Amino acid sequence: MFLGTHTPRLDDKGRLILPAKFRDELAGGVVITKGQERCLYVFPAPEFQRIADQLRAQPMTHKAARAYSRVFFASAHDEVPDKQGRVTIPGHLRDYAALDRDLVVIGAHTRVEIWDRVAWESYLAESEDDFADIEEGVLPGL
């Protein structure tokens, strides 16, 4: 399970050093793709395969599933982290998430998310006030 907030920097070659606590789970390979709210999702390869299997199970006639699959898979980039725990974020994904040098990498249960630092701070400012209200709808009875 991926937890926590980390603040690495993107190097001049578009590489990110993965947080040390995430490296073992991601060492076998990752898939980086577009996420919602203009962040990037980083999945361990087996988790990405699980999601791919779920999408494959949707009927081809399901318009929303087709649209989601197109964006999700067309933007995906698979890679094995190097010995230093680095992965290269392709230019089209850096552009999508408006990534600058200063990043925020968060653990989000079964995936890792990569955010531009300013975008993450803005997202938190908008979302934290509603956090208590959202909990009851997402986790009733907690």
Curated annotation (Swiss-Prot):
User: Where does the signal sequence lie?
Assistant: none
Matching Gene3D superfamilies = Transcriptional regulator MraZ domain
Output the GO biological process annotations, alphabetical, semicolon-separated. Answer: negative regulation of DNA-templated transcription initiation
The protein's location, in the record's own words, is:
Cytoplasm, Nucleoid
What's a Gene Ontology MF term here? Answer: transcription cis-regulatory region binding
* Protein's UniProt keywords contain Coiled coil: no
Q: Which GO terms describe its cellular component?
A: cytoplasm; nucleoid
Which residues belong to any copy of the SpoVT-AbrB domain?
Answer: 5-47, 76-119
Keywords assigned: Cytoplasm, DNA-binding, Repeat, Transcription, Transcription regulation
Cross-referenced PANTHER family: TRANSCRIPTIONAL REGULATOR MRAZ
Family designation: Belongs to the MraZ family.
Q: How does it assemble?
A: Forms oligomers.
NCBIfam families in the record, alphabetically?
division/cell wall cluster transcriptional repressor MraZ
Please report the name of this protein according to its UniProt entry. Transcriptional regulator MraZ
- Natural source organism: Salinispora arenicola (strain CNS-205)
